[in-house]
Swiss-Prot record:
The protein, known as: DNA-directed RNA polymerase subunit beta'
Residues the record lists as binding Mg(2+): 461, 463, 465
Presence of keyword Metal-binding: yes
Annotated organism of origin: Vesicomyosocius okutanii subsp. Calyptogena okutanii (strain HA)
Entry similarity comment: Belongs to the RNA polymerase beta' chain family.
Reported cofactor(s): Mg(2+); Zn(2+)
Coiled-coil annotated residue ranges, if any: none
């Protein structure tokens, strides 16, 4: 019996491999795979259900139908193993060989492989240097191809129509030249091709050509020819002589009841090929007329095309149900294809699924598992235990016992389940916290009980969500689940490093309620010796929960890592807070909880606890908080009632005033004073402001109540209104929702995003009228539609991110680089959004950090910034710190842990083997889905940002300007004429506390270095228009202003002023098409001296007259701004996708290509010529479209990379002109802006990791002495490595420039073709990989999952290291043995001589 088992083991031996190579298969190779030729199109005999001999399911070719039994039944059982039956020809072996044995068809005529023909760029076309159209004409028998011109004037590879061919035959005779049709002709040309000669010719041609187009073409061909030479692929193998046939069990034929069969589409496609092939062979035998043979050959070509890739050329072959048949290509591509359906994701056979309910008494690491479910899931363990206990003699008996559910089974189940972790998973699993391990507690009922605190990580709620349970079977799996995945070990969020097990909703409400204070309560003023005494007093009804009392508390301080008691002190507090302090861990200050505990406070508490105590304390504290929160929220009796929604009395008056203002503006519009756009904008502004006012009045009314104190005085304190408490505590609802309940709903958006100018003045408590209800439906529906669409978009973004980052793993401790990124505090307007301390927390310094204004070192180079350091950085007011970053890491494969810094989810330096690429992708993608789902929470209420028209500072300080260019106007104010100016306010320590952007045309009321005080207005501007400012005093001359043709003259009825409006170019008459209206500024006294010219866009308004004199800083024209649209997250998700795809915006900004002085050259019809002359006299020309507004003027000095014309930034330009660091800062800043807008906190690290992957490629500018071709793209790491080698050999180095690739492109351009093929464009990737003979070294995670090995990350990282070490050791041993044997032989030979 043992030996038999050994035989089974031998059959399943797998070979170890380190790489996979893909290439073209030669006819010999295909025949070597095959176990026999398939000659007939028959499948199986419908009576006997046995496969037909030499048919598509032939047992002789593909193997036996049943294990160890030949087809005719002569040989059965194991003893005839590997015997070939002489009667039916079937080998006696396992039936599973039918899944791996291939067959083949000998084709009667060669056939071109459609992938190499039609997959762009066409490899055949490129190699033969012919157009795809021409090759197709030859292949499908429409034209002849000259394969050997002989001595005739015909040219090699010339195309001849039938007429031309016969003419040539008549003229030269058929012995003089050779011309063929079909794949045969192509094959002849390819087999005659001498690749080395071709490569040499191409190199010579590319050196001799001046044409860029030709050079590109030569380089493309040279690359293909070189790759064919290197890979050993022969070009003629792109044409098939032998067609391989898939093993029969991979294209099954299943008999259904009623004598019908279900079959794989491939069988139909193979049948067509075999039928046509047999017919062609017969025709050739019979020597049929050429035209019939040709037609049959064409049909064979088409049949093979549709087998390999149906529908790629011509119409797809349909099945009998009128849908295209699924070809081999369709089998592997797309979501249902082999890669994504079966290799990257598989269904699990050991799992359960049920609804989840709340388990408020569970500990954090526990879950409640229904007994019924546990019994099914733990069956193998129960059987085993029953047998070892001797309760059941066989598995069968054990099975019976379990089925009958006898009492001892339940006892054994208890024992089996004890401390055996199970995995819980909630779909969609957006990040790794979507699967966590818990210890099961057996419960009655059929629902899984889940700990409320892990709901945040799973994004679960108890409104009918379902979860799946998986059982880790092996001991290694159990160990990993317990140490790495247990819920109590995953306390921090991997995106931001903040606690994720934060209590919410009821728990927060309970804690908030118990820690609120109230005056004039029973027991006010009592003094308690400790918290227990306070609890006893509360439970004996001597004091109320909110009474103000005094409490003696014990403080702790840290000694040798332990908290020891220190002084005692008395604090003013409330009874509730005293009770809460009983669960506070030693070492957490009472001051942290001596306030009404809202969600923010709880979050901070857990954070501080995690940082100061160990993990276990934190988890226990969170659990205790939860139990207490539930207890007191029950006692509070807080409910939701319509009387709690108090409508402010002043509301009616506010709305009345707003209506009067709107009426005024309407009148101004009807008189023609303002344009419709301006009217609309102003109306929106009025209603937005009113909405805010009503909301404020409502919050004042709901948020405060009058209470009488002990002395009988009335005091205004925070109210105990239920709705207010829910929102204020952060338990549920928000001020935005409260304003809709009892303020006014405000402005609504149309489905296209524009705001409807009639707001909803009612709220939900008053109720909506028909019209208002109808307007509301827009928002509600748009919310739902958006959610559905954006969820898909967000999922796709995550998928692309995972794909680009999947092979990035921490591979070493320190790469030793000095490079890094410079971090600064992020300041937006008057708020510090992110302090420098927070930004650098958990990062490693790249150079010494000095104390401000001294040379004393504060942090040494290579120091990991801790929490204490981070606080100190903020205190000291350090401006900027250079930290290590994964973008600048020098590790060849992966990233080193010093460049990455802290592991966000663990709070210590990241370990080797962590898959940081996938973590980054999940961290960025997960909130994407959250954001998309957030749209309908405010019910579509359009929160239109009221137009900002001035800068008012919040703090006292000194004003400093950056990039400010200005001119002084008549009133001695500064008028800003630069586009990227900013003003910063620094406090008395010199720390930057506020930063504002100043738009072009703004008026500034403070000088550089001037002192400002809080509330000062330092700048203002018109928010509704873009002005064009005159930079010198002078006279205005209008050019091409022709009334009725290029401009219209209008009069403002209110002011009586006239103004010009442009007529859009599209609407002008033919006569006016050539006219270009512009304003010239000339010297006041001399019209010949032109100071400047201003081209005008079509939407402009001009309030000047011709020849008018204007002062410097005057407004020449105004361009009205667009109507205000709601800023929904629509800006968000597509914006993030655009940034990561590195898309160029349509009208992107134009940056200066060099540093120097600007001048303007001769412009062309549509473009201006801008010349930058450097100090060395080198001129750089830039051509800029006339419609782009150029922000620079003649004679101005400009730096390389400065903005010349406004617009969204182009990341490719930033990389090219300003470098990698500038690009990294730009992408990080822009992505963070989107997420910050939604209040999502993501660490910069994750974005940097993705940017690193986008910068993987370089373009070779000069290949030096390397094997690269100029203009080729190559992997950055490979080029650096090669440069080291070239430098060591004293050869010419490679000159390159970094390329920025979008994530999709970067995923497809990865070194691993398996990973790229499983992502997108499968056929294109595989075609390219096979022609170039690509080798996949299986570095990334995806490739390893696909080939079924442990991933080289986490615990698998060590496994692969050990495997490689063993491999190297075995090779070394073999080498040493061989050397020893050789030296022994030599010795022997010497001795003999």
């Amino acid at each position: 019996m043992r030996d038999l088992l050994k035989i089974h083991k031998l059959e399943q031996k797998e070979q170890d491999f380190d790489a996979i190579r893909v290439g073209l298969a030669s006819p010999e190779k295909i025949r070597s795979w095959s176990y026999g030729e398939v000659k007939k199109p028959e499948t199986i005999n419908y009576r006997t259900f046995k496969p037909e001999r030499e048919g598509l399911f032939c047992a002789k070719v593909f193997g036996p139908m049943k294990d160890f039994e030949c087809l005719c039944g002569k040989y059965k059982r194991m003893k005839f193993r590997n015997v070939v039956c002489e009667k039916c020809g079937v080998e006696v072996t396992y039936s599973k060989v039918r899944r791996e044995r291939m067959g083949h068809i000998e084709l009667a005529a060669p056939v071109a492989h459609i992938w190499y023909l039609k997959s762009l760029p066409s490899r055949l076309g490129l190699l033969m240097d012919m157009t795809l159209k021409d090759i197709e004409r030859v292949l499908y028998f429409e034209a002849f191809l000259v394969t050997d011109p002989g001595s005739t004037p015909l040219v090699h590879k010339q195309l001849l129509t039938e007429e031309m061919y016969f003419d040539a035959l008549d003229e030269y005779g058929d012995d003089e030249f050779e011309a063929k049709m079909g794949a045969e002709a192509i094959q002849d040309v390819l087999s005659d091709m001498k690749l080395e000669v071709e490569a040499a010719n191409l190199r010579e041609d590319s050196l001799n050509t001046k044409s860029q187009t030709k050079l590109k073409k030569y380089n493309k061909r040279l690359k293909l020819v070189n790759s064919l030479i290197q890979s050993g692929n022969k070009p003629e193998w792109m044409v098939l002589k032998v067609l391989p046939i898939l093993p029969s069990d991979l294209r099954p034929l299943v008999p259904l009841d009623g004598g019908r069969f279900a079959t794989s589409d491939l069988n139909d496609l193979y049948r067509r090929v075999i039928n046509r092939n047999n017919r062609l062979a017969r025709l050739l035998e019979l020597d049929a007329p050429e035209i019939i043979v040709r037609n049959e050959k064409r049909m064979l070509q088409e049949a093979v095309d549709s087998l390999i890739d149906n529908g790629r050329r011509g119409r797809a072959v349909m099945g009998n149900n009128r849908r295209p048949l699924k070809s081999i290509s369709d089998m592997i591509k797309g979501k249902q294809g082999r890669f994504r359906q079966n290799l990257l994701g598989k269904r699990v056979d050991y799992s359960g699924r049920s609804v989840i309910v709340c388990g408020p008494y569970l500990k954090l690491h526990q879950c409640g598992l229904p007994k019924k479910m546990a019994l099914e899931l733990f069956k193998p363990f129960i059987y085993n235990r029953l047998q070892t206990k001797g309760l059941a003699s066989t598995i069968k008996a054990a099975k019976k016992m379990v089925e009958s559910e006898s009492p001892e089974v339940w006892d054994i189940l208890e024992r089996v389940v004890h401390q055996h972790p199970v995995l819980l998973n909630r779909a969609p699993t957006l990040h790794r916290l979507g699967i966590q391990a818990f210890e099961p507690l057996l419960i009655e009922g059929k629902a899984i009980q889940l700990h409320p605190l892990v709901c945040g990580a799973f994004n679960a709620d108890f409104d009918g969500d379902q979860m799946a349970v998986h059982v880790p079977l092996s001991e290694e799996a159990q160990l990993e689940a317990r140490t790495l995945m247990l819920a109590s070990n995953n306390v921090l969020h991997l995106a931001s490093g903040e606690p994720i097990i934060v209590p919410s909703q009821d728990v927060i409400l309970g804690l908030y309620y118990m820690t609120r204070e109230m005056i004039n309560q029973k027991g006010e003023g009592l003094i308690f010796v400790n918290a227990t005494e306070a609890l006893n007093a509360y439970e004996s009804d001597s004091v109320t929960l909110h009474a103000k009392v005094k409490l003696r508390i014990q403080d702790y301080h840290k000694v040798n890592g332990k908290f020891e008691p220190s002084a005692k002190r008395i604090v003013d507090t409330t009874v509730g807070r005293a009770i809460f302090s009983r669960i506070l861990p030693n070492g957490l200050s009472f001051n942290l909880i001596n306030e009404a505990i809202s969600k923010k406070v709880v979050s901070n508490l857990i954070h501080v606890c995690y940082r100061t105590q160990e993990l276990k304390q934190t988890v226990m504290f969170a659990d205790q908080m939860m139990y207490m929160g539930f207890q007191y929220s029950t006692k509070s009796g807080i409910s939701f009632c319509s009387n709690d929604m108090i409508i402010p009395d002043s509301k009616a008056k506010m709305i009345e005033q707003a209506e009067i203002q709107v009426k005024d503006i309407q009148e101004q519009f009807s008189k023609g004073v303002v344009t419709d756009g301006e009217r609309y904008n102003k109306v929106i502004d009025i209603w937005s402001r009113t909405s805010e006012k009503v909301a404020k009045a409502m919050m004042d009314e709901i948020g405060f109540e009058n209470f009488t104190d002990v002395d009988g005085k009335i005091q205004k304190l925070a109210s105990f209104n239920s709705v207010y408490m829910m929102a204020d505590s952060g338990a549920r609802g928000s001020p935005a929702q409260m304003r809709q309940l009892s303020g006014m709903r405000g402005l609504m958006a149309k489905p296209d995003g524009s705001i409807i100018e009639t707001p909803i003045t009612s709220n939900f408590r008053e109720g909506l009228n028909n019209m208002q209800y109808f307007i509301s439906t827009h928002g509600a529906r748009k919310g739902l539609a958006d959610t559905a669409l954006k969820t898909a978009n967000s999922g796709y973004l995550t998928r692309r991110l995972v794909d680009v980052g999947q092979d990035l793993v921490i591979t070493e401790n320190d790469c030793g680089t000095d490079n890094g990124l410079i971090m600064k505090a992020v300041i937006d307007g008057g708020n510090i959004v992110q302090t420098l301390g927070t930004a650098t927390l958990g990062r490693v310094t790249a150079e010494d950090v000095l104390m401000p204004d001294s040379i004393e070192i504060f942090l040494e180079k290579g120091h990991l910034v801790s929490l204490d350091d981070s606080d100190k950085i903020n205190e000291l007011g350090i401006e900027s710190i250079k930290v290590r970053s994964s973008i600048t890491c020098d590790t060849r494969y992966g990233v080193c842990s010093s460049c990455y810094g802290n592991d966000m989810a663990r709070g210590h330096k990241i370990g080797v083997g962590e898959a940081i690429g996938v973590i980054a992708a999940q961290s960025i993608g997960e909130p994407g889905t959250q954001l998309t789902m957030r749209t309908f929470h405010i019910g579509g209420a359009a929160s239109a940002s009221t137009a900002v028209s001035s800068i008012n500072v919040n703090t006292d300080g000194i004003a400093h300007f950056e990039n400010l260019k200005s001119i002084t106007n008549e009133n001695n104010d500064l008028v800003v004429i630069s586009r990227s100016s900013e003003v910063t306010i620094r406090n008395n320590k010199g720390q930057e506390v506020e930063r504002y952007k100043i738009p072009y045309g703004a008026i500034v009321h403070v000088q550089e270095g001037g002192a400002v005080t809080a509330k000062d207005k330092i700048s203002d501007w018109d928010p509704h228009t873009h002005p064009i400012i005159s930079e010198q005093a002078g006279r205005v001359i209008f050019v091409d202003f022709v009334e009725g043709m290029t401009v219209n003259k209008n009069t403002d009825p209110l002011t009586g002023l006239t103004f010009f409006e442009m007529i859009d170019e599209a609407e002008r008459s033919t006569a006016a098409k050539g006219l270009k209206p512009l304003i010239k500024m000339v010297e006041e006294n001399d019209s010949e001296v032109v100071l400047s010219t201003h081209y005008l866009p079509s939407t402009v308004k001009i309030n000047l007259d011709d020849n008018q004199v204007i002062a410097a800083g005057g407004v020449l024209a105004k361009i009205p701004k667009d109507l205000s649209k709601t800023s929904d997250i629509t800006g968000g998700l597509p914006r993030v996708a655009d940034l990561f795809e590195a898309r160029k915006a349509k009208d992107h900004s134009i940056l200066a290509e060099a540093t120097g002085v600007i001048s303007f050259g001769n412009s062309t019809k549509s473009k201006d010529r801008l010349i930058i002359t450097s100090s060395e006299g080198k001129a750089t020309e830039m051509m800029i479209h006339k419609w782009s507004q150029i922000n620079v003027f003649d004679g101005e000095t400009i730096e390389k990379g400065d903005v010349i014309s406004d617009g969204p930034s182009n990341p490719h330009d930033i990389l090219r002109l300003l470098g990698v660091e500038a690009l990294a800062n730009y992408v990080v800043r822009e992505v963070q802006n989107v997420y910050r807008l939604q209040g999502v906190n993501i660490s910069d690290k994750h974005i940097e990791v993705i940017v690193k992957q986008m910068l993987r490629k370089v373009e070779i500018l000069d290949a030096g002495d390397s094997s690269f071709v100029n203009g080729e793209t190559a992997e950055y790491g490979r080029v650096i490595e090669m440069n080291y080698q070239l430098e060591a050999q004293g050869k010419d180095l490679i000159n390159y420039q970094r390329l920025l690739m979008g994530i999709t492109k970067a995923s497809l351009a990865t070194e691993s073709f398996i990973s790229a093929a499983s992502f997108q464009e499968t056929t294109r990737v595989l075609t390219e990989a096979s022609t170039t003979g690509r080798v996949d070294t299986l570095q990334g995670l995806k490739e390893n999952v696909i080939v079924g090995r442990l991933i080289p990350a986490g615990t698998g990282f060590k496994h692969h290291q050990v495997r490689r070490a063993q491999y190297v050791e075995s090779i070394t041993t073999q080498t040493v043995d061989a050397q020893q044997a050789l030296s022994d032989q030599l010795k022997e030979a010497e001795e003999q001589t």
